[in-house]
């Protein structure tokens, strides 16, 4: 029973550790994002080197780059639209859950 009521110092330590854990999780996510970004850059350069051949004109290379840029911009647009659709669905589910919770709270106890 000695540890049943945490001391103020225990609570402070818990909060400190919890905040540190959250900070480390954010740092992990940031590093993972940097890894993904750099892997994508490597892949982009690999793709570019597949298209560029010796003796190509500067204009041909610029055309390839413009085409790749357009493709990536289209993908970004598609992801923005997909993200908006997912966010809309998430908001709708949140509203439904909130409404269900409010109904449950206001129900008389005998009807359950």
UniProtKB/Swiss-Prot annotation:
Coiled-coil annotated spans: 14-41
Protein task: Pole-localizer protein involved in the regulation of several cellular processes.
Name of the protein: Pole-localizer protein TmaR
InterPro entries: DUF496, UPF0265
Principal localisation: cytoplasm
Upper taxonomic lineage: Bacteria, Pseudomonadati, Pseudomonadota, Gammaproteobacteria, Enterobacterales
Family: Belongs to the pole-localizer TmaR family.
Subcellular location: Cytoplasm
């Amino acid at each position: 029973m000695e540890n049943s009521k945490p001391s103020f110092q225990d609570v402070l330590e818990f909060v400190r550790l919890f905040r540190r854990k959250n900070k480390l999780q954010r740092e992990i996510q940031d590093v993972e994002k940097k890894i993904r970004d750099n892997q994508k850059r490597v892949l982009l350069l690999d793709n570019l080197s597949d298209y560029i051949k010796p003796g190509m004109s500067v204009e041909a290379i610029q055309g390839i780059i413009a085409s790749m840029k357009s493709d990536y911009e289209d993908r970004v647009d598609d992801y923005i639209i997909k993200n908006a659709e997912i966010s809309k669905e998430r908001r709708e589910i949140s509203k439904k859950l909130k409404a269900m919770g409010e109904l449950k709270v206001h129900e008389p106890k005998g009807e359950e």
